[in-house]
Curated annotation (Swiss-Prot):
The protein, known as: Phosphopantetheine adenylyltransferase
Residues annotated for ATP binding in this entry: 10-11, 18, 89-91, 99, 124-130
Site (Transition state stabilizer): 18
SUPFAM superfamilies: Nucleotidylyl transferase
An example Gene Ontology CC term for this record: cytoplasm
Species name: Bacillus pumilus (strain SAFR-032)
């Protein structure tokens, strides 16, 4: 069994901040499963399938990245993949407070799984999918915030 991590998120859409964490995780872990979750409290712009495909395109040069969707408990997905680590990115203290709740619950559900927090690079500390969608919705440029494929997909969604 290798050194496997799961990097979960809604990724609606994937940003360069997300990719920073995914790519840095790929240097540390033998395999990283990017797990696209459908967050019932959010109304997604892209379908789960579209989000998976956009991440696949953005990570196509990284052979140890696998992109899948999952509906259910994250710890169940991690166990299914034989992952012992959940990889999460942190931007600010508010992210930590939110993540701490999820981490604590995951420990209750499966004590064998650890959470690995990685600080986002400063250049992405303000970046979120919500901000990207808001800027794109009003015809603002998201160049330098998302991969080219996502930039094109956003234009298509809002102008299509």
């Amino acid at each position: 069994m290798g050194n496997i991590a799961v990097c979960p998120g809604s990724f609606d859409p994937v940003t360069l901040g997300h990719l920073d964490i995914i790519k840095r995780g790929a240097k540390i872990f033998d395999e990283v499963y990017v797990c696209v979750l459908n967050n019932s409290s959010k109304k997604p712009l892209f379908t789960v399938e579209e989000r998976c495909e956009l991440i696949r395109q953005a990570t196509k040069d990284l052979p140890n990245i696998k992109v899948e969707s999952f509906h259910g408990l994250l710890v169940d997905y991690a166990k299914q993949k034989e992952a012992k680590v959940i990889l999460r990115g942190l931007r600010a203290v508010t992210d930590f407070e939110y993540e701490m709740q999820g981490t604590s619950m995951n420990k209750v559900l499966n004590d064998d799984i650890e959470t690995f927090f990685m600080m986002t690079n400063n250049q992405y500390s303000f970046l979120s999918s919500s901000i990207v969608k808001e800027v794109a919705k009003y015809d603002g440029s998201v160049k330098g915030l998302v991969p080219k494929e996502v930039e094109e997909a956003l234009i298509e969604k809002f102008k299509g």
